[in-house]
Amino acid sequence: MSLSVTRENFDEWMVPVYVPAPFIPVRGEGSRLWDQQGKEYIDFAGGIAVNALGHAHPALREALNEQANRFWHTGNGYTNEPALRLAKKLIDATFAERVFFCNSGAEANEAALKLARKYAHDRVGNHKSGIVAFKNAFHGRTLFTVSAGGQPTYSQDFAPLPPDIRHAAYNDLNSASALIDDNTCAVIVEPVQGEGGVIPATKAFLQGLRELCDRHQALLIFDEVQTGVGRTGELYAYMHYGVTPDILTTAKALGGGFPIGAMLTTQDYASVMTPGTHGTTYGGNPLATAVAGKVLDIINTPEMQNGVRQRHDAFIERLNTINARFGMFSEIRGLGLLLGCVLQTEFAGKAKLIAQEAAKAGVMVLIAGGDVVRFAPALNVSDEEIATGLDRFALACERLQTGGASCG
């Protein structure tokens, strides 16, 4: 018999680095979840842009079960068929010629930054070690990646931090240009800053970064952990901009809920990563890569990407209607199904309160800082789920505006 558990047990047993919602989800199907009490929620959080095909997608369950009945793990002393097939699919679908598999976005970004330093050291010299990143970015929680992320709140308690990392203002080419020089080995940027407020890069900004990197022989790294795998209406967001990175990192939606990450690059850059320079125990395991292969099969189609664009329009139309009623948002922005509603000054700092009220109303949403409500639903969310979920979100907005909201 299974141990009976409650939300209170989290506070008793877990390291307190999170403050989870007061309910515990126990079952999901598509874009719906149910908690221990049987209450239904429409899921517009998507596991923070992970559940690209919703919960318990039949094809993903089938792929996982089929591989689970074969074998689970061998370690990096052996390769496996699902990993090789997934690598080929990613290469065929992108600019990449080489793939490194890992387990998360942080690991993918760690690998990307290490590759950039190794390439610069081997080809130029150890003095070429500078990394330029951007304020309010998020690249992971390892010491290297949290230092590259431009949010001191996440890194200030862990000094001394890795050196030679500087931060420019996002979408400000002059700010970046002032920092990028011949000692820069890499520039790492999110095409859409997710945690930083759902802010899409301008085309001129990314094109300018490409030109600066070419001029100074620095590698351009696109962190597509949140924007990748169809989230923006293209398989990867770089395809919107006509700007090709040297390295791309991907995770989150790649496994549709099963943990996996990957770093994509070219043969030339990958060639410096010789045996022993980097590694992973679980990365590229057959369970993860079997599921991710099926995710790509489903998402990397014109029909799916057209559907994302159509659903984007449906969200924007309904969110604008909600805003016309309540006047809570100064801006609604984003690409595809990564959307952010920026709160008016009157409601500044209340994004978390809105998310809490939304959950009470039966819809799960995210925040991106204190002033932005974020949506990252499944790419196959239905019209009915969009309508029902946003009706519930409107109820949460109404409660907040009329003073009926309460913390908790």
From Swiss-Prot:
It comes from the Bacteria. One of its GO terms (molecular function) is pyridoxal phosphate binding. The modification N6-(pyridoxal phosphate)lysine is found at K252. Keywords: Aminotransferase, Arginine metabolism, Pyridoxal phosphate, Transferase. It catalyses: N(2)-succinyl-L-ornithine + 2-oxoglutarate = N-succinyl-L-glutamate 5-semialdehyde + L-glutamate. Disulfide bonds: none annotated. Pathway: Amino-acid degradation; L-arginine degradation via AST pathway; L-glutamate and succinate from L-arginine: step 3/5. It holds the Pfam family Aminotran_3. Its cofactor is pyridoxal 5'-phosphate. Catalyzes the transamination of N(2)-succinylornithine and alpha-ketoglutarate into N(2)-succinylglutamate semialdehyde and glutamate. Can also act as an acetylornithine aminotransferase. This is Succinylornithine transaminase. It comes from Salmonella enteritidis PT4 (strain P125109).
